[in-house]
Amino acid sequence: MYDVIIVGAGASGCFLALTLKYKNPNLKVALIEKNDKLGKKLLITGNGRCNLGNTNIMMDSYNSSSSLNSFISQLKENDYLNYLKNFGILTKKEDTSTRLYPYSNQAITVCKSFERSLEKEKVNVIYNYDVKDVTYKNDYFVINNNLRGKKVVIATGGKTYPKTGSTGMGYNILKSFGHTITKLYPSLTYLKTDYKYIKDLQGVRTDVVAKLNVNDKTILTEKGQIQFTKDSLSGICIFNLSRYVSKYLEKDKKVDVVVDLVPDYDESYINNYLKEFDSYNVSDAISCILNKKVADVITKNLKLSKIRA
């Protein structure tokens, strides 16, 4: 019989298991994981570098209707950094960024630190264990008819990246115990587009200002790098817009993403610039400012290829 069984050996599951043992070393804690190693999703965060957090935490960074003010007010950066040091994890921030990364720049460092700490604190980590059923009887929980615990914590994460094990199974378990699951929307993801020339832009990366327009009204603006793929828009600024798109599409709203490819110059400046090079082919003139692929698509889209600037 375990005092606590934690389902899911991701970041939250590992943190919880270690925190419980730090507070009470005598607790019998089990951490169960369906994969053959912990932190599988953690390994791919930050493009393999591991996102450890952000020091600029504010209420408007969250999309929940619940008030998190009391929770956020208790968060102290130094406390968190010292907490990570307990596991042997040193951190860094890049230039003016508020994002935290391991000093090694490798997510595997964080996972290995978790493994060593869990072993040191005598947490029983059970790998390749797929939870099918959780029941409650006789004042304790039973998992798959063979694991028993006084408390069970579901730390399985959401439904993103199912190849890492996040299939949404935890939601079903929670529902079976009467919990309410809020509606889920895709977030931090690319946006598919029906723009007819998108394939011609594949591979292009450039800094832009991207606006999310709903029924022709701008509701959100993001600045950053955009990446064009064969059928979609990607990049941090698009990821930040993505969480709102599904909500409005679900309401049958007209949703457009408008991209300013030259955000550092206004329209009149660009017009005057093009006039100064009126002997150029339009595509050549625009390609002095933008990626050649982008210039070609603009002139093709506007049917300007053979017209002088």
Feature locations, PLM:
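Short loop/edge segments at beta-strand edges and connector loops
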Residues: V125-Y129, K183-Y185
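Short beta-strand to alpha-helix junction loop
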Residues: L68-K76, S97-R116, Y161-S166, K196, ...
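An anion/pyrophosphate-binding glycine-rich loop and adjacent beta-alpha core
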Residues: L52, N56, L90, T180-K183, ...
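Short hydrophobic core segments
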Residues: I5-V7, I32, V131, L147-S166, ...
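Glycine-rich FAD pyrophosphate-binding loop
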Residues: K21-N47
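N-terminal Rossmann-like FAD-binding beta1-loop-alpha1 element of flavoenzymes
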Residues: Y2-L31
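Glycine-rich active-site loop/strand segments that organize a redox cofactor
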Residues: G46-T96
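A conserved short coil-to-beta-strand element within the FAD-binding core of flavoproteins
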Residues: Y127-Y140
